[in-house]
Design a protein with these regions (language model features):
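A motif-centric signal for short, conserved binding hotspots located
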Residues: 98
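Acidic, proline/glycine-rich low-complexity IDRs
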Residues: 114-139
Length: 140
């Protein structure tokens, strides 16, 4: 019940802002750009393709193989649920600093705009995406 109430306050634009922040620098150390085939595999009801793995190194030839550990397809509600899990005062996913950014975004929410995604930096966006993908923080 409470989870649904929290999730309903996170707008589609809030989710997109979190994903954009993560893609711009939050997840780039553990995730790589999806291929056309991975994008094409997007199931109905899912909006985002997150590939856990590494791309070939742009300079060093000895590291020229793309490695994929998993391909994760997320819906907006998957991201909302991860945010909700991280908002919980008793959460054990992240340290107090990252938790504080998430709390600040919730505290400064408005009826019209949802949460204040301006508080979600690359580190916070990273852990939101990790919890959405893996239900844990594996990296960082």
């Amino acid at each position: 019940m409470i989870t649904q109430q929290i999730m309903s306050r996170i707008t589609d634009q809030n989710v997109q802002d979190i994903i954009d922040t993560a893609a711009a620098g939050g997840i780039t150390y553990w995730a790589t750009e999806p291929t056309d085939e991975e994008f094409a595999g997007l199931p109905e009801g899912k909006e985002y393709t997150i590939v856990e793995g590494t791309a070939p190194h742009p300079i060093f030839a000895f590291d020229d193989v793309r490695e994929v550990d998993s391909v994760n397809y997320l819906s907006k509600d998957d991201v909302r649920l991860a945010y909700t899990k991280l908002l919980d005062p008793g959460q054990e996913y992240v340290n107090r600093e990252l938790h504080g950014y998430i709390l600040d975004s919730w505290r400064d929410r408005t009826e019209a705009d949802g949460i204040d995604a301006g508080h979600i930096d690359a580190g916070a966006a990273d852990v939101i995406v990790q919890v959405a993908c893996f239900d844990e923080v594996r990296y960082g």
